[in-house]
């Protein structure tokens, strides 16, 4: 993804130059409808670039899958630190397509409303929060769009409103805490089912709708006419296969201890057949209810099929006999989703929050999907799925938008 990384560095340089030249009178100031076009990404970890450092999975050591190195999440102008700690806006994030300027405002853990998590990390929502120098993503978008020609906004939001992370934790805990002859499923835990009541689905759909409308307000405040920019609303991809598609048996603990995918078959089937469709339907219903001009839906539910975590069609680096992520064909033989880590990652470069997120290859696939949706500026929606094996000229997995 060399071309995409060069585009990102160009973005950093432009941001730094803008800061340096404050007060100078440009001949033609960029802004609504003026200047090079930009795509801005907003939302949560499924668009911020979470886990984008790692290409595939390995239990033999980090070096075999470390595609970006220790600066992967450093998104400030100098590429020396995170702008917001633990937002994990990686340099492989999908908005850096290589075909159009990209700017990443998304933050891992974000919900529709701004909050501070239990560990004290600030999580900007799709709102106009402003306090102590911290801002919501809608306000950040408004500021950026006023001085850049934003032609499209890509958004992923809603998963954390449904407490996706806690659900995954419950599923893995139940897998590890019960035997195969008497499995304890997470899909009937009260803490899980509470997220999928009719009342909560309605409430979260409304919250997502409100977040999307805040994006329109931000663009209006920045001087954009409705319809002069496009909103690309993406849903969520399936990260694990159905029960029959795992390459590790659910008997014993290998599924988690080796594969990092501790789900009972029954829970994996429920996740793909009920939980994911419910969340994705809420996202799409919210987009429809918001009624924002030039809204396009980018459907990703099946985008990673065949490359999902622990799927029988792929494997760990060592299971496939590869020297490392850089080996020819690695993109087609290894997983596009990061392993689930449930214990302390102290002493390693891994983060628990990277669990079950699109990795370096996954981010590249999503970037290709977004490129196809961008469509040279004639933005379109559709269903994105895997294309032919191999990589395109930008180092991304081949994808198809239909």
Predicted regions and their residues:
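Secretory targeting and sorting signals
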Residues: 1-29
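Catalytic nucleophile-elbow at a beta strand-turn-alpha helix junction centered on a G-D-S/GDSL motif
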Residues: 37-54, 65, 160-162, 360
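A structural motif corresponding to the C-terminal end of an alpha-helix
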Residues: 91-102, 204-230, 267-268, 272-300
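Short, solvent-exposed loop/turn and secondary-structure capping segments
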Residues: 32-33, 49-55, 114-118, 164-169, ...
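Mobile gating loops/cap/lid regions near enzyme active sites that modulate substrate access
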Residues: 238-357
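Solvent-exposed loop/turn segments at secondary-structure junctions
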Residues: 45-49, 107-113, 159-164, 236-241, ...
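Short amphipathic alpha-helices and their capping/turn segments at secondary-structure boundaries
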Residues: 26-41, 134-153, 209-230
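Conserved SGNH/GDSL esterase-like catalytic core that processes O-acyl groups on lipids
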Residues: 62-200
């Amino acid at each position: 993804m060399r071309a995409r990384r060069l585009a990102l560095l160009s973005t950093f340089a432009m941001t730094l130059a803008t800061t340096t030249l404050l007060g100078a009178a440009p001949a033609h100031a960029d802004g609504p409808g003026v200047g090079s076009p930009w795509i801005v990404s907003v939302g949560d970890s499924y668009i911020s670039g979470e886990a984008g450092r790692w290409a595939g999975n390995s239990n033999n050591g980090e070096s075999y899958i470390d595609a970006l190195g220790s600066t992967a999440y450093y998104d400030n102008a100098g590429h020396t630190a995170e702008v917001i700690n633990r937002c994990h806006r990686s340099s492989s994030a999908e908005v850096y397509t290589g075909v159009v300027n990209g700017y990443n405002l998304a933050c891992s853990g974000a919900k529709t409303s701004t909050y501070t998590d239990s560990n004290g990390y600030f999580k900007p929502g799709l709102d106009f929060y402003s306090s102590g120098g911290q801002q919501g993503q809608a306000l950040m978008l408004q500021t950026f769009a006023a001085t850049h020609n934003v032609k499209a906004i890509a958004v992923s939001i809603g998963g954390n409103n449904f407490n996706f992370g806690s659900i995954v934790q419950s599923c893995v805990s139940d897998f590890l805490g019960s035997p195969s002859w008497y499995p304890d499923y997470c899909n009937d835990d009260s803490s899980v089912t509470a997220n999928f009541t009719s009342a909560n689905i309605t409430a979260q759909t409304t919250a997502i709708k409100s977040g999307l409308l805040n994006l329109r307000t931000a663009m209006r405040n920045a001087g954009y006419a409705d319809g002069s920019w496009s909103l690309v609303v993406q849903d969520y991809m399936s990260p694990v296969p159905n029960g029959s598609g795992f390459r590790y048996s659910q008997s014993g603990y290998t599924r988690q201890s080796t594969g990092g995918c501790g789900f009972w078959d029954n829970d994996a089937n429920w996740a793909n057949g009920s939980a994911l469709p419910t969340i994705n339907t809420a996202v799409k219903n919210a987009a429809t209810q918001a009624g924002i001009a030039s809204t396009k839906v980018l459907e990703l539910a099946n985008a990673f099929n065949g490359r999902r975590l622990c799927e029988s069609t792929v494997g760990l680096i060592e299971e496939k006999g590869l020297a490392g992520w850089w080996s020819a064909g690695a993109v087609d033989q290894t997983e596009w989703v990061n392993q689930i880590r449930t214990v302390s990652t102290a002493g390693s470069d891994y983060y628990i929050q990277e669990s079950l997120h699109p990795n370096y290859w996954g981010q590249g696939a999503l970037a290709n999907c977004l490129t196809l949706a961008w469509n040279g500026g004639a933005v379109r929606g559709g269903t994105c799925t895997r294309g032919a094996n191999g990589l395109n000229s930008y180092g991304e997995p081949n994808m198809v938008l239909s």
